[in-house]
Amino acid sequence: MAAAAAATEQQSSNGPVKKSMREKAVERRNVNKEHNSNFKAGYIPIDEDRLHKTGLRGRKGNLAICVIVLLFILAVINLIITLVIWAVIRIGPNGCDSMEFHESGLLRFKQVSDMGVIHPLYKSTVGGRRNENLVITGNNQPIVFQQGTTKLSVGKNKTSITSDTGMQFFDPRTQNILFSTDYETHEFHLPSGVKSLNVQKASTERITSNATSDLNIKVGGRAIVRGNEGVFIMGKTIQFHMGGNMELKAENSIILNGTVMVSTNRLPSSSSGDQFGGDDWVRYKLCMCADGTLFRVQVTGQNMGCQTSDNPCGDLY
């Protein structure tokens, strides 16, 4: 190789040497190989699939978009609620125009307020200012005050109070009880100025009136007076006015103690003619024993008296 190189240098020093086509091709191939090796120096082939991927891709990207959209919707709802509260409470540069908050826990409304349901806290008080009325109005609906099972309903045509234990009305200044249904401690009295009491059903031990006034019980339909251990009616004069029938029922006996008067003005009378010829009517005669016991005797003929063996008077007849 050294001799060939020396010969080549000797030939080249004498002048250009003509090379064959084969030698030129080999020389060109060697030059290109050397050039390519120099171009790829420091180059390392990298597989992109094996690289660490950064950012949110695939399902994580979709989840991130959903979270962002949800936060945006919540922000819009929060903005709407804030605007509504701002418009209702009327918050301005000088504070709240519709209400005041005090350090003692008092909440004061400075204008007409529209509310649905109010839930006061434990031992809370709802009231008005001094020398001013507290006006509570329901829009075509009753106003209901309720605490547990006790309820006060104020409607357009009536006011109803519902309670399991009872109720009391007292003067807030003097603390005097004006009206109470605690029969064990206070006797039931109608308030001053109240002339009548309208109830559907009343359960009590005794019903009395003043010594100078009458006790009137009036009903539009049917009145039922019932006692678990008997019914006692006492008075200077007792009158029953009925448009229909009066029925007295007792397990043991009915005692009428006093002067008993039966007005026959409204009793039906038979028409003239044959009074005992037809079978459509059954007639009775009202009789009384010496002790005041009333009984009836069926009338079967004319001029019939109360003499019958079947009577509660014993051997009197």
Curated annotation (Swiss-Prot):
Regions that span the bilayer: 65-85
Post-translational modifications: Disulfide bonds are present.
GO cellular component terms attached to this protein's record: cytoplasm; cytoskeleton; sarcoglycan complex; sarcolemma
Family assignment from sequence similarity: Belongs to the sarcoglycan beta/delta/gamma/zeta family.
Cystine pairings recorded for this chain: C287-C313, C289-C306
Taxonomic classification: Eukaryota, Metazoa, Chordata, Craniata, Vertebrata
Name of the gene encoding the protein in the UniProt record: SGCB
Protein name: Beta-sarcoglycan
Subunit structure: Cross-link to form 2 major subcomplexes: one consisting of SGCB, SGCD and SGCG and the other consisting of SGCB and SGCD. The association between SGCB and SGCG is particularly strong while SGCA is loosely associated with the other sarcoglycans.
